[in-house]
Amino acid sequence: MTEKQNLFGPVVRLTGVLVVLCGLIYPAMVTGIAQGVMKDHADGSLIYEKGEIIGSKRIGQEFTSAKYFHGRISSIAYKAEGSGSNNYAPSNPELRQRTEESIEKWKEDNPSVPVREVPIDLVTNSGSGLDPDISPKAAYAQVDRVAKETKISKEELKAIIASHIEGRAFGLYGEERVNVLQLNMEVKKRIQ
């Protein structure tokens, strides 16, 4: 037997073992642990309405109607297959132009809110293009518009927002946030 033939058997066996280990055992183990420890996350954090999936708590959706709260700006129009955004440096003139355009759009949609009070997350693009959450300040900044369009009182809308504020992860990481889809589902219930 040649040296090449002596190596062939162990290489084939090692390949087979690695395929089974990495392609079957490891994924099955990780899936099993995820299903046991955090089933909602493992299943995609899906949100149902009348038995139909209407979205995910983890992936943002575009809301353009004035009667609903709006999320972060998405460079990819919330298409999950192409996650990402133009990551402009602060010195890039295109970032300034894009932000100024967002501010102008904000002023058209929300004339009662002074520009100096516009939360940054409503006029800057999401890094992933899929952010499902906004800051509580961003939600409260939209109350006048939503109240006008839906005839829900401002006080009631503020209470809805307050009830949907999620704290920091583990009390340490990130910032307080409001899930836009869940918030808008509550608004939809109130106007039906």
Curated annotation (Swiss-Prot):
- UniProt GO MF annotations: ATP binding; P-type potassium transmembrane transporter activity
Disulfide bridge map: none
Topology term for the membrane: Single-pass membrane protein
Which GO cellular component term is one of those annotated?
Answer: plasma membrane
Q: Does the keyword Membrane apply?
A: yes
Q: Where are the transmembrane segments?
A: 14-34
On whether Repeat is a keyword of this UniProt record, the answer is no
Enumerate the subcellular locations listed in this protein's record, separating them with semicolons. Cell membrane
Alphabetical keyword list: ATP-binding, Cell membrane, Ion transport, Membrane, Nucleotide-binding, Potassium, Potassium transport, Transmembrane, Transmembrane helix, Transport
Family per UniProt? Belongs to the KdpC family.
Q: What does this protein do?
A: Part of the high-affinity ATP-driven potassium transport (or Kdp) system, which catalyzes the hydrolysis of ATP coupled with the electrogenic transport of potassium into the cytoplasm. This subunit acts as a catalytic chaperone that increases the ATP-binding affinity of the ATP-hydrolyzing subunit KdpB by the formation of a transient KdpB/KdpC/ATP ternary complex.
| NCBIfam families (alphabetical) | kdpC, PRK00315.1, PRK13997.1
Subunit-structure text: The system is composed of three essential subunits: KdpA, KdpB and KdpC.
**Annotated protein name in UniProt:** Potassium-transporting ATPase KdpC subunit
Q: What organism does the UniProt record list as the source?
A: Bacillus cytotoxicus (strain DSM 22905 / CIP 110041 / 391-98 / NVH 391-98)
What's the name of its gene? kdpC
